[in-house]
């Protein structure tokens, strides 16, 4: 009996010796010193890289941002409620990256590119770094193709080109998101992939935008990246970079893409919150010193690629909110200096019923007419000048009692041109319809109408052209020029 036990024991020992694995696992580990407000301070992690992902014992992931001599400051990508003092932390050796694929089109995802629309997982075999480097000088070419927004005021006077960065700036409730969403709706049949990034917004506002896209068939070519107001600051900070990585995937596949950041003021506030909690020194308006770099490295990723790289493009339309129209605040001035122009939306114009409430005098596109088709250049040349003269005359006319006939005519023309620029939300116009509208206004065909009749007349004119003069649209679409034949067809219709 004793022998049997000894045999059993020796066989167990032999078995254990055979199964013994002498591989040594080396891990970069640390322990939590302190946690709260979405920030954890970690002792250890001596070889961690800046921006490296770290994993806590409960599965929460964070990013190492502050590398101190005695501890590491980590921002959490979750609520971190299960993390306690003394919990273990492991460095993953990875920088934040997301899966990318064509299957993302039509989906709503969060800042980690995980679906949040309840339509199941998204299949992807490729990965992109969230913080990818921007294309270099040799990889780019100058912007020369238009990105049509469908808004007359923008396409005629503040044209946006494919690969440009055009800031949309204005107070809250002035129609900034409406301009951006109309631009996405207008890309239907234009072969442009759109990414809409919602940062720190109400969930109801994001749902409304997604519903609009679904009703109008725009989700087929759109990806929505959403981190709402109740999301951790880390995810609100990351969301724009995730959107840019998804758009870049299509740009490097020789496609045209456009991205809306709605809005970067909220991203800057989330970054300020993280920086102050990490005890980084505050600067102007309590923002950290590198808040300019926060936005410049994001917006520099917009580009028109060279012919060697396939001529894809990424057009960025960042939105920034101002307080009481103050464009000289810190974040607005930063964004204006980084971008290639701005569309300024005015609360006064919005309240006066001029919508979209674009202040043409303060708005500018630094790409200019290079991003317009020849037909638009030809008819829109006079429009900006006439509107500028009208604005000056209107201010002067408030003090003058008797005006000569020429001045009265100019004021009447200006009022009708201003009426011509008004558009309903979610009703973008095709470029040929815009050209017909502008030509009608600048050549005096609206002068005999009452101001209240102008919009109705223009709607009927556009319908008549589509129904009875389809050649007009065909000429402009195929040649891109306002030929004598097109002019004759339009004048017949008028």
Curated annotation (Swiss-Prot):
Subcellular location: Plastid, Chloroplast thylakoid membrane
Assigned EC number: 7.1.2.2
Membrane topology: Peripheral membrane protein
An MF annotation (GO) of this entry: ATP binding
InterPro entries: ATP_synth_asu-like_sf (IPR023366), ATP_synth_asu_C (IPR000793), ATP_synth_asu_C_sf (IPR038376), ATP_synth_F1_a_nt-bd_dom (IPR033732), ATP_synth_F1_asu (IPR005294), ATPase_a/bsu_AS (IPR020003), ATPase_F1/V1/A1_a/bsu_N (IPR004100), ATPase_F1/V1/A1_a/bsu_N_sf (IPR036121)
Signal peptide region: none
Record family assignment: Belongs to the ATPase alpha/beta chains family.
NCBIfam families cross-referenced by the UniProt entry: atpA, PRK13343.1
Function: Produces ATP from ADP in the presence of a proton gradient across the membrane. The alpha chain is a regulatory subunit.
Cited HAMAP family: ATP_synth_alpha_bact
Protein name per the record: ATP synthase subunit alpha, chloroplastic
Organism: Pinus koraiensis (Korean pine)
Designated gene of the protein: atpA
């Amino acid at each position: 009996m004793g022998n049997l036990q000894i045999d059993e024991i020796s066989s167990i020992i032999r078995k254990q010796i055979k199964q013994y694995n002498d591989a040594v696992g080396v891990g970069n580990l640390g322990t939590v010193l302190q946690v709260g407000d979405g920030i954890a301070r970690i002792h250890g992690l001596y070889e961690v890289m800046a921006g490296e992902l770290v994993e806590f014992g409960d599965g929460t992931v964070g990013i190492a941002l502050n590398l101190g001599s005695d501890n590491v400051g980590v921002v959490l990508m979750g609520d971190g409620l299960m993390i306690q003092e003394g919990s273990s932390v492991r460095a993953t050796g990875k920088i934040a990256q997301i899966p990318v694929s064509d299957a993302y089109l039509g989906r709503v995802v969060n800042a980690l590119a995980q679906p949040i629309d309840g339509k199941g997982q998204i299949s992807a075999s490729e990965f992109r770094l969230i913080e990818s480097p921007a294309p270099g000088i040799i990889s780019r070419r100058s912007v020369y193709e238009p990105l049509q927004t469908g808004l007359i005021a923008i396409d005629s006077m503040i044209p946006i080109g494919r690969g440009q960065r055009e800031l949309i700036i204005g107070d809250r409730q002035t129609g900034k998101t409406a301009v951006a969403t109309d631009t996405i709706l207008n890309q239907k049949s234009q072969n442009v992939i759109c990414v809409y990034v919602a940062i720190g917004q109400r969930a109801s506002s994001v749902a409304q935008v997604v519903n609009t896209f679904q009703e109008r068939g725009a989700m087929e070519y759109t990806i929505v990246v959403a981190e709402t107001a109740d999301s951790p600051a880390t995810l609100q900070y990351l969301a724009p970079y995730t959107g840019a990585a998804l758009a870049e995937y299509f740009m490097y596949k020789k496609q045209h893409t456009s991205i809306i950041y709605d809005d970067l003021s909220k991203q800057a506030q989330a970054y300020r919150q993280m920086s102050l909690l990490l005890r980084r020194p505050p600067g102007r308006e309590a923002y950290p010193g590198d808040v300019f770099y926060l936005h410049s490295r994001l917006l520099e990723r917009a580009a028109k690629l060279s012919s060697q790289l396939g001529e894809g493009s990424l057009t960025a339309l960042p939105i920034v909110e101002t307080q009481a129209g103050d464009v000289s605040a810190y974040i607005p001035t930063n964004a204006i200096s980084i971008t290639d122009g701005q569309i300024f939306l005015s609360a006064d114009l919005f309240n006066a019923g001029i919508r979209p409430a674009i202040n043409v005098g303060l708005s500018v596109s630094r790409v200019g007419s290079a991003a317009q088709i020849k037909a638009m250049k030809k008819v829109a040349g006079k429009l900006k000048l006439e509107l500028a003269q009208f604005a000056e005359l209107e201010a002067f006319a408030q003090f003058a009692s008797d005006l000569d006939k020429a001045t009265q005519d100019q004021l009447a023309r200006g009022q009708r041109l201003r009426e011509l620029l008004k558009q309903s939300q979610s009703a973008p116009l095709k470029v040929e319809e815009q050209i017909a509208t502008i030509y009608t206004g600048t050549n005096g065909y609206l002068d005999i109408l009452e101001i209240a009749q102008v919009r109705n007349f223009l709607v009927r004119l556009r319908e008549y052209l589509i129904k009875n003069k389809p050649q007009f649209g065909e000429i402009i679409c195929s040649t891109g020029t306002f030929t004598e034949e097109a002019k004759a067809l339009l004048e017949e219709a008028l």
